[in-house]
Amino acid sequence: MSILRFASVTREIGAFVILDAIEGAVALGDRIGLVGPNGAGKTTMLRLAAGRDEPDRGTVVRKRALSIGLLAQEAHFDAAFMAAPDLRTAVRTGAAHLDAMAEELAAFERDGRVAQHAYADLQHRYEVLGGYTLDQRVEATLSGLGFTRDEWVRPPTGLSGGEQTRAALARLVIADPDLLLLDEPTNHLDLDALEWLEEHLRRRSGSLVVASHDRAFLDATVTRVWELRDRRLTGFRGDYSAYHRQREERDVRAAKDAGTQAEQIAREQELVQRYRSHRKFSKMHEHEARLERLQAERREAPRQSRRLALPHSALAGGGPARSG
């Protein structure tokens, strides 16, 4: 069952079509890598999924009450985050719903007239959602993403650009939405933080769509791949390496089909000219009709694009190099 679906979604910016009637669905527990050349529309897709932008045509269908978290390439924080006295408190604002539940539990405890079953139900939900371990999880997340204990007590207003991105990621980890959307999340992570994030994403039960140029990261975290190419979306099963093999096989088949079709078109053009020169117009019209059908169905050979061959993060300058 899908929790989010792109239904014939088209997105245009001025005269340019960025996405053209794309179709795709995210199921509960999916971990999807979103790949394609720079400018293909990956960020646009993530913003549409998050509801930050609206499609020009088509619909983004979301499951009712679906919680969505988006990590943009440039972090933007709300007033609650920026007003926090320190980084640890700021990151904790990602779990504001748990703090609200804790206040409700405290109110129940002060009011002896509250039904015991209502209190027990709320307490159980609070425990299942990790309320009793929230402080430990905040500290573990900050440590995992490379923040030292000294940095935990710094005000969020003093964060650098890279620190802001890591802080935004930490807050999303604590929020733990049903659908996590990440746009180039490895950009400001060292190797230890990168490996911590990979392990976290593999463990979490929620769904994930991540746009990244880091092949090793995608191999470590995703089980499906969406490829954006020429304004269209194509899905593949498996990690990045499996996708790359499937894409190469598909491109070889497409190139062969395009070559065969080009030969057929050339042959029909030759016959049209031959019958025209001999004034055999009935035959000429017959082959003109065949030629029109072939040209209408014409398949182009896949275009080779160096940008589409995703580099390792070290080559792209987007993260740490790895061995192995």
Indicate where each model-derived feature is located:
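Short coil/turn segments at secondary-structure boundaries
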Residues: 104-106, 138-139, 287, 303-307
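Alpha-helical coupling/stalk and coiled-coil linker elements that connect catalytic or binding modules
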Residues: 269-274, 280, 292, 308-314
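Leucine-rich amphipathic alpha-helices with coiled-coil/heptad-repeat character
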Residues: 105, 112, 126, 133, ...
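Short, surface-exposed loop/turn segments at secondary-structure junctions
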Residues: 153-154, 277-281
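A short, surface-exposed helix-loop junction/capping segment
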Residues: 116-123, 266-274
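ABC ATP-binding cassette signature C-motif
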Residues: 1-254, 313, 318-324
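Intracellular alpha-helical coupling/juxtamembrane segments of multi-pass membrane proteins
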Residues: 246-271, 284-298
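Short, flexible cytosolic linker that couples an ABC transmembrane/permease module to its adjacent nucleotide-binding
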Residues: 300-318
